[in-house]
Amino acid sequence: MNSHELRFAFGNPVLYAQIRRVMQKRLTYLSRATLIDLCNAIQAVERQQVKGMILEAGCALGGSAIILALAKQSQRPFSLFDVFGQIPPPSPQDGPDVHERYREIQSGNATGINGDDYYGYVTHLEDIVIANMSRFGININTNAIQIVKGLYQDTMHIDQPVAFAHIDCDWYESVLTCLTQIVPHLSIGGCLVIDDYEAWSGCRKAVDEFFAMRRDSFRFVMKSNLHIVRVAK
């Protein structure tokens, strides 16, 4: 356990125990450090009383959504966007790494965490996510959680301020759609976490292109993943 994790564990023993439990139950692909960083970002938003909703784009089995739901104030709206099925194909804007990964998924040979079934092959995935949240004592109604199923370009229509967004959707077009829809509504002090900036070429390209002419309004911090905080409108 490094010093960063140790500080979090001592300061947030209940949340830390839940992070360990989420990982033990193989509900997330994220590292422990990444989940801790997500918690710290949510706690900063709550501490600073940043206005707006929380959202996650791409929730897989719901592991990170569980941690975000536990870290936020129960009354703050939280929307989970996902196709809740097999990921859509990449575009020509994505690099060879992305297309190779998609071929593996499409072939039926992708595997999940520690050899489990790959979540993209599972039917009724949204029901599994809701059930996983329930196992951690999270009721989606009393915790102001909304499940939004479908392609982001069809479903992501933001009409309120955003305090925090976890963007975990891999490919160029998906990431660019999320940024285009979310960033105009991101409050000052609000935070974006880009999960796949270093993992997939298309994600990195979408982020770099989108923020190329907007950098002065944001602070970019590379933690376990890329965190982007709005500092000005």
Give the label of every model feature segment:
Residues H4-R32, R47-K233:
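S-adenosylmethionine/decaboxylated-SAM
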Residues I36-V50:
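Conserved alpha-helix/loop element of class I SAM-dependent methyltransferases that forms part
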